[in-house]
Curated annotation (Swiss-Prot):
GO molecular function annotations of the record: hydrolase activity; metal ion binding
EC number(s) reported in the record: 3.5.4.-
Organism this protein belongs to: Homo sapiens (Human)
Protein name per Swiss-Prot or TrEMBL: Putative C->U-editing enzyme APOBEC-4
The keyword Ribonucleoprotein is annotated on this UniProt entry: no
A biological-process GO annotation: mRNA processing
PROSITE patterns linked: CYT_DCMP_DEAMINASES_2
Keywords: Hydrolase, Metal-binding, mRNA processing, Zinc
Amino acid sequence: MEPIYEEYLANHGTIVKPYYWLSFSLDCSNCPYHIRTGEEARVSLTEFCQIFGFPYGTTFPQTKHLTFYELKTSSGSLVQKGHASSCTGNYIHPESMLFEMNGYLDSAIYNNDSIRHIILYSNNSPCNEANHCCISKMYNFLITYPGITLSIYFSQLYHTEMDFPASAWNREALRSLASLWPRVVLSPISGGIWHSVLHSFISGVSGSHVFQPILTGRALADRHNAYEINAITGVKPYFTDVLLQTKRNPNTKAQEALESYPLNNAFPGQFFQMPSGQLQPNLPPDLRAPVVFVLVPLRDLPPMHMGQNPNKPRNIVRHLNMPQMSFQETKDLGRLPTGRSVEIVEITEQFASSKEADEKKKKKGKK
């Protein structure tokens, strides 16, 4: 295996050029070291909050992509942690870098057969657009290493809205990736997962600050993401958050689930402390309120009203060789096909035949 990356020892881990040909660039502040491992992978709280939409939820469009990762053994022991950042100069997504053939993860697993599980924590769900092919690379990676499982947690869905030109490709690719369940898990970051990311990857956060409660705006966004990914893939995320207010309604399935699952460590009397100098978004007071939450299997929650029926059976596509489509065809994906005249003719003839039969019966009756 001839690697395409270069790795250098740093003070608290390693720094990696995902492609040997990358160099320092004025167009990208992270070039050329887009992958960092160990304690070098930590980022500032300010950067994390801006990119991941924490703790209030996403308040403005985010162009940067950041993915934290953990490599673990079958027993759950941590082998390595790190992060990959997008390259704005060459327009490369972090998932594309990590899962490149002969890339960093390919080499890591090839040289360490104890790695059995990869966990990603990304600000965006992976895409499969032509310039990136992130999901295709993940799919091929999993075929190459059949003993590896992959869990993907994200803070927002990326380019899956129907009015985006490439959304059809992204949604279809997410369905294909989700069809590999239980080897692959696609789920929004929620609840205690936020605390885990803060503890493992964010610098300057420690003690009780790590476990402060998730605010309502963020919790609602996470729950919305859970139902959206379910609508797209047909596979339910295993866990999602339930707000404490749900407990006031004793007639819901969520109430039963609340009583069955213990509360996580949270501090309902505190707000999440933002970095000094960073302004809080102008949100309604209820979206800034702290939330005591429980993690409940999504199957135990009452359904939400959505455009698509999440219980509708789906045909899972297990390949990613998608046909080429023109831009105009992509725009027309949401349009309903026009009716066929043959159907109208059949209905007209049916109606006419029935009318003639009735007239004949009337004439016979007169005779």
